[in-house]
Amino acid sequence: MDKRENTASHVLARFRGFIQAAATLVTNIHLPNFAKGGIYQGAGKTVCVPGLNCYSCPAASGACPIGSFQSVVGSSKFNFSYYVTGTLILIGVLLGRFVCGFLCPFGWLQELLHKIPGKKFSTKRLKALTYIKYFVLLFAVVLLPVLVVNDLGMGDPFFCKYVCPQGVLEGAIPLAIANAGIRSALGQLFTWKLAVLIAVVVLSVLFYRPFCKWICPLGAFYALMNKVSLLGIRVDACKCVSCGKCSKVCQMDVDVVRAPNHAECIRCGKCIGACPVDAISYRYGLDVSAEKLPLTADKK
């Protein structure tokens, strides 16, 4: 493993929090719009941001890829969203779930909530719940907007309308605070979405990134690309001493030695910092050498 590569990996992992904050700010750069009660509608809204960030957020500088995809597949013309799908595939191939670990505002929020002092619970025995997000992607994002339509042939953006807590947090709540007309129009749907948001907030305090692990369709899409993405995690078999510290520190419940580029790995780099022999690093490119060992990390 190249020494410069290892050093760069440690630096990237160490400054992840700053990168998350910067990514959130860039994704929501139009902060004065919170006071104005309006949303930015400029040219930037024709570009999809990589993470989950509501189009209706007053500060949003770009479009949410999930919302953009649903607005097209649910239209009466039923045009397949080549642009959005192509953008997602490109990001997935280049970065995989690095987006979740470094660039997603809602992922960062869940991490901050989990830092609130109190009893925490492991999700290792709840791994079956990670498959829910794939059903959300297939049904709530793709199939239902196409199959369930009104008399005009228009489908609802089911995930954005009925599930996504980010839409309430970034869009509905700040817009309702600033606009009396919007406040007066709030009804049962807002109450339901607010309940979803509260549930996610509470769960995020107790569990590490529950929405990312179990519900997020964007995370599900990037997870499908994780093993083929150019940015990944490398474990040097010659250096690894099978101490198991990497897997113990992983809050995404990944067996780092056995499957360093598992679908649930968000490239957070905690395993890199935990390794006592510097056997783990980020890698970029098609090189998959020294990527896994035959034994799990907790065996010697």
What residues fall within each predicted segment?
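Non-ligating segments of multi-cofactor redox enzymes
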Residues: 1-257, 263-300
